[in-house]
């Protein structure tokens, strides 16, 4: 199963009491701005913006902050010029890594991302070298305590999901990109709150890691995710949940 979705679930729980909430706000504001710039300010016709607004409200972001971010995206409010960039690379053990960045300084971020790869046993790669290892899918993670397998399976398959996987402490639901919102809304209507729901780059296969390589890989992901300009990190590692919990606790 996907060790990376376990990481996302455990990190989500930790973030609720973490000093990193300010960074979460910054990342969501940038996503709102980019989503509005690319697809317009109307969430009814812009699925990416709809998802970003839901994420903002899930973090109790004030409506004024949401509206200002959208207005900056459409150019109605002045703000920094942001570029969206995807970097590709390899982590320990040949794990494929995609790093989605929103930045106001493309030259600076290239050198910083390269440094974060190299100091954690990895290296950056050319465009296309790693991207083929992933496909774009809806990815919904539901804590196991929220629902039984039978209950969640019936809901998500009826709503258009492709797959449900047991990922240790969570259920991982995979959907076509265009069905993600429908599946998420079906879960919510049934009283089931996902830990996360997004259109993501989901690995087509996984690289099993343990011991020092696993710890080094998790340090790389955490270092990348902590950077203000990094929106998402996708990686095809499979690491035992106990090792992930130990890394987060440490």
Predicted regions and their residues:
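N-terminal cationic and glycine-rich segments that engage phosphates or anionic surfaces
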Residues: 1-116, 121-125, 130-139, 208, ...
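Positively charged, low-complexity, intrinsically disordered RNA-binding extensions
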Residues: 139-250
